[in-house]
Amino acid sequence: MKRSSTHAEELKLRLMTIELLQAAKQHYTYRELSSKTGLPVTVLSRYAKGHVLPNTERARTLWKILKKLVGLEAELGRKIRFNKNGYFDNTWIVGDFNILRQAASHALNTFAGRRVTIILTAAVDGIPLATMVADSLGVNLVIAKRNKEVGVPAFLEETYVLSNSGVTMTLYVPKNALKRRDSVLIVDDMIKTGETQAALINIIQRARAEVAGVYSLIAIGDDWRERITLPKGCPIEVVTKVRPK
């Protein structure tokens, strides 16, 4: 069994390296990639087109090089944008399949060994990432929505006030979606004030489930940390932090 697991991991690395190479091809020519990797253009082309897979040793070498060029942090750095009013524009992040795929793999590696039975996110921008993470971890996804759905008999709900606007917000989760024995990982594309994540934590605790951790691609500043209270030893993983404009 151990031998099969090793082969599976090696194959996964080789396939993920090809995916990174295909992502790199969006920003660099084959000639540029050849210069950076030391591999002939023809070899890189065959890899990128899926005609052949690199062996494990070459995949490891390529992975290290490509990760610096188009790895998760590098890609986020390219896509993070603020508009003229200083508001964060996540349009080019939540729909980027390369970023979502890498983020899901990163979440899998980060929370490996921890018990996670449910992924919880708030509608709407966190849904693509949460879906990918749930698929990667092999667990179900629960979405906290801003409106009650017809046909759902009972809800867990949490109301909070958005600090910057004074607007009241309520999140609703079907009552039977979270069970007492669940260990719930909160996933979102961005943490700004921490209020949404704090509300999700309260919903989990109201269901008497366990908080497994919080995972986010981006965090704006550090003020949000004051609003998020997690059980001792419960991790918060943020891929990239940016300063508020």
What is each of the regions a protein language model found here?
Residues 2-13, 201-245:
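PRPP-dependent phosphoribosyltransferase catalytic core
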Residues 129-137:
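Short Gly/Thr/Asp-enriched flexible loops that form oxyanion-binding sites at enzyme active sites
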Residues 139-184:
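Short, glycine/charge-rich flexible loops or terminal/linker lids adjacent to PRPP-binding catalytic cores
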